[in-house]
From Swiss-Prot:
Pathway: One-carbon metabolism; tetrahydrofolate interconversion. It catalyses: (6R)-5,10-methylene-5,6,7,8-tetrahydrofolate + NADP(+) = (6R)-5,10-methenyltetrahydrofolate + NADPH; (6R)-5,10-methenyltetrahydrofolate + H2O = (6R)-10-formyltetrahydrofolate + H(+). NCBIfam families: PRK10792.1 (NF008058), PRK14186.1 (NF010783). Its EC number is 1.5.1.5, 3.5.4.9. GO terms for cellular component: cytosol. This is Bifunctional protein FolD. It holds the Pfam family THF_DHG_CYH. Belongs to the tetrahydrofolate dehydrogenase/cyclohydrolase family. Transmembrane segments: none annotated.
Length: 285
């Protein structure tokens, strides 16, 4: 049977349309527009692209995006002071600090400074802890988006063996918690894992997030598996490639996400969902 490509582009479009509809409904009831503060420190080209995409989505669906483009020389104290002001601002529902930050700024301290109820990236220890305790509120956007992509396959995830390649705080670790919550048996692999191939070959669901082009050999994919490729790497030829050898993997998988057009659009869409959630909780507090 031919592989089914899971389109993140289509699902993201649908998701953002639903969020926009909810926002219009709230505004018709006399509520203010949701507010999202987006902070960018420095001029990293990739970060500028990501931030631009997030701001564009806000404009499309009716979220007031407040931009804070700060110079590379911004001190940690200055950034924390801005976050404190935004935490107190009743018109700001979400605060997003684009990572990575310059080396002289402690990203952990910055993430922890954001009020948990405004942490729309889902990185604050409080929100990660709630996910671990099976009571999630604001969830890390990429894993959250991946779970929505998995829903479109129609599979019952209970009891499936999910293997995650990469154990980052942004994707791998919260992804493990999401899949546990969905009833999967979860294996997390990382740079110290021995015999990675053996683990990958057993995966009913494979999530790869290492940032290395075509790191996973397509021949390793278990027949009928679902492959979620989080990586997005630009080669010397200018083409974008994922962390998995797509063509070979597609010969064996039942479902696979493309690069681009797979996980990436859903990450931004779930940021919009989280901002709406924070906005709703603000009024229901």
């Amino acid at each position: 049977m031919a592989v089914q490509v899971i389109s993140g582009t289509e699902l993201a479009k649908k998701t953002k349309s639903e969020v926009a509809g909810q926002i219009r409904r709230y505004i018709s009831l006399g509520r203010r527009v949701p507010g999202l503060a987006v902070i960018l420190v420095g001029s990293d080209p990739a970060s500028q692209v990501y931030v631009g995409s997030k701001r564009k989505s806000c404009a499309e669906i009716g979220i007031d995006s407040k931009s804070y483009d700060l110079p590379e020389t911004t001190t940690e104290a200055e950034l924390l002071s801005i976050i404190d002001d935004l935490n107190r601002n009743p018109n700001v529902d979400g605060i997003l600090v684009q990572l990575p930050l310059p080396k002289h700024i402690d990203s952990t301290k910055v993430i922890e400074r954001i009020a948990p109820n405004k942490d729309v990236d889902g990185f604050h220890p409080y929100n990660v802890g709630r996910l671990c305790q099976r009571i999630p509120t604001l969830r890390a956007c990429t894993p959250y988006g991946i779970m929505k992509l998995l829903e479109t396959t129609g599979q019952d995830l209970h009891g499936l063996h999910a293997v995650i390649v990469g154990a980052s705080n942004i994707v791998g670790r919260p992804m493990a918690m999401e899949l546990l919550l969905a009833g999967c048996t979860v294996t997390v692999t990382h740079r110290f894992t021995r015999d990675l191939e053996e683990h990958v070959r057993r995966a009913d669901i494979l999530v790869v997030a290492v940032g290395k082009a075509e790191f996973i050999n397509g021949d390793w994919i278990k027949p009928g598996a679902t492959v979620i490729d989080v990586g997005i790497n630009r080669g010397e030829d200018g083409k974008l490639r994922g962390d998995v050898q797509y063509a070979k993997a597609a010969e064996k998988a039942a479902f696979i996400t493309p690069v681009p057009g797979g996980v990436g659009p859903m990450t931004v869409a779930m940021l919009m969902v989280n901002t709406l959630t924070a906005y709703e909780r603000h009024f229901n507090a």
